[in-house]
Amino acid sequence: MVEILGKSRTAVLPLAVVGLVLSLFPIVYLHVASVGELSPISHTISDYIFVDNGSGLLAVTALSLAAASVGLLVALVRSGLPRRGPVAVLIGLWAAGLTVATVFPTDPSGAPTSFSGAVHRYAGAVMFASLPLAGWLISRTFIASTTVRRFSVAAGVTSLAFMVSHVAVVYPGSGAVVLGLFERILFALLYCLLFAVASAVLRREVSS
């Protein structure tokens, strides 16, 4: 009976990892397909909605990533994480931010900020702040993982750099526009963080 319960507790974890992996395919395709059309240095990932099939593919990535993150949260809770604690709230905000940013797309470069563009921007700020902090709290209060902690700190620093890089967009001529580069580094670190958390949960379940 104990063995059956253990399997049921961890059944959601492989699904979350599969969701993380599958969410990568559309965004990688968009990067390859838009070479010469969008700059990975100056254009954000959200700008892929303006290329052929970009809106749908980007939505698949964002919503798959949100669903996988919720699945990972379920795995964390089944491993003993408090259901109503700050980590659950922060991961929920991350997933919600991804969803809201998908429903409210960004504005074209140089266009005035619309209601949708403003909501998209604030949703991005919430999600990019939430996940690094959630990872740091997991490593400090739930699963002692140096890897999770390092990716959390690196993602937090890069998230701050991404926010600061918007200055060159808001005030043209104040510096090089590199927010696309920082955002891509940030997403790479956030993916690594999510995979690191999944690995830490698996190790915890195996050892229990």
Give the label of every model feature segment.
Residues 206-208:
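Short, highly charged, low-complexity non-transmembrane loops/tails of multi-pass membrane proteins
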Residues 3-204:
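Hydrophobic, aromatic-enriched alpha-helical segments typical of multi-pass transmembrane helices
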